Amino acid sequence: MSHVLVNVAWPYANGPRHIGHVAGFGVPSDVYARYERMKGNDVLMVSGTDEHGTPILVEAEKEGLTAQELANRYNRVIAKDLCDLGLSYDLFTRTTTGNHEHVVQEMFKQCLENGYIYKGSQQVAISPSTGRTLPDRYIEGECPICHAEGARGDQCDACGNELDPDELINPVSKINGETPRFEQTEHYFLDLPALAEANKAWLETRKGWRTNVINFSLGLFKEVKPRAITRDIDWGIPVPVKGWIDNPNKKLYVWFDAVIGYLSASIEWARRQGDPEKWREWWNDPKCPAYYFMGKDNITFHSQIWPSEMLAYNGKGSKGGETGPMGPLNLPEQVVASEFMTMEGKKFSSSRGIVIYVKDILARYPVDAVRYYISVAGPESSDSDFTWAEFVRHNNEELASSWGNLVNRVANLINKNFGEIPPLDEDSMTNEDRGLLEEASAAFDVVGSSIETHHQKHALSEAMRVVGDINKYISATEPWKIKDDQARLGTVLHVAAQAVSDANHLLAPFLPHSAQKVWEALGGTGTFSPLPELKEVEDLDKPGFTYPIITGDYELGVNVHPWKSEAIEVGAVVPKPAPIFAKIPTEAVEEELARFDEALAARRAAEAERLAAEKAKLAAE
């Protein structure tokens, strides 16, 4: 048994998450974690809601809430949505815990002591009405290079050039339309140049990364600059330095603290297990691989910023230094970044109303239909497009007609003719019987290898190929026509049931909810594919502060079945089956498109009204 760390990108708590989000960080990470558990490895899968930074403040002010109140609201919404999606976290927590604050501050202090954090100043954009730092992407104006309108303070989408906010022509705040002021303010910086050589050397040892991820990551080192890790803001983790710790308007930058969440969540998990040092088995053992799952917009933070923070903490940059008491910390084995998913040809955007929220789609459609579509059509190595027509087609043709119908046919034939799993009569077996069983058993290596190398689309297609071949076997053997040879009929149905059971094992990481139903349809008892649970807990360090966590019991041999062919139990009672998957009416496509157009128009009207009110308020002042 090996230890495997699965770190999942932290969803930002300024609103509910949509399908584009979970297509990048959610379902792929869960498929991988479930597979590794079935292989017998000791998996620790962690994440949580990212709750600091300006966007939280902006959204809170829109809704008349404090930042903490808004974070509390969406922490609960997001945790429930991800739990309902079946994401099997060992711990899904949040960044406003006392534990997280302590771990972040300890990281900062050790990096400072080692010389990789220093004090300096930089020109920043300030909101005149609030006095807060405006993030680069909250400023827009005319591009100084191609002169396109709507260029952001970090990049112009029209020409692709990176920008600084003060380079924009006629810059304005996207929040309220005011013109920002630019001024020099004092900040702490992470000395990325002093860590660049070690960071790049580590990257060059990485094997098996997706081509776009490793190429983008190495490209970050063409020109490396120090990065400010504090902000002029009143919402965030206090800077643990004398003269700063009590300053209400200086906080650590949200991205400095968010990536440390993987470590702090692991520590919180261990503390909640009653074994406070157990997290070290995943973080301090150099033989334990750590896999990070995210969308491609987060690559920078996981192949440069977070590794640099760990190198600084470990004292492994050009300035040397001591390893802190939590170290040495393991750098990522692999950054598994997906591309982007669009919706009906448009870029997902919550602010623009181009969105399908997880809660909404799960309220109308089966969870495994959603997981399947994300897995088969998601943005694994290139951008992909969510369309309602394809969602319905994949469900109806592949889940309902092919897989679900197969399970029902086999279970119904067994129930009707035997009432239980019939024995296998070796004397009546044919080469066709043996060939199907051998193919299904051999598929574990093929599908498993693809999941291990993060080619989940190929893995799923291979599993569904087995399903197709079982259907062909049923059609070829025609068990409904075998009337006078019970031994042969029993053998055909035993072979079919064994192959279906094997296919169910292969599909379980992708379809955990229906896997349980298939298991029971073939006479299985107990838990086959465990699901996560929401649990209300009290903060370990802030009495009275409560929040939901996602956790679960995923123990091989107890409620997790192994990644191999398990012999079905002869004599197990097979009940009259109920449908595993239902077809979605084709009319749903037009209904969903109409619902989307209506919601989009309403969102645009509401946003225009809000911005007009903000401008009127500024003018009145």
UniProtKB/Swiss-Prot annotation:
Segments traversing the membrane: none
Residue span of motif 'HIGH' region: 11-21
Cofactor note as given: Binds 1 zinc ion per subunit.
Binding site for ATP: 350
Example GO BP: methionyl-tRNA aminoacylation
Cofactor(s) the protein needs: Zn(2+)
Sequence positions that bind Zn(2+): 143, 146, 156, 159
Keywords: Aminoacyl-tRNA synthetase, ATP-binding, Cytoplasm, Ligase, Metal-binding, Nucleotide-binding, Protein biosynthesis, Zinc
Protein family per UniProt: Belongs to the class-I aminoacyl-tRNA synthetase family. MetG type 1 subfamily.
Protein name stated in the entry: Methionine--tRNA ligase
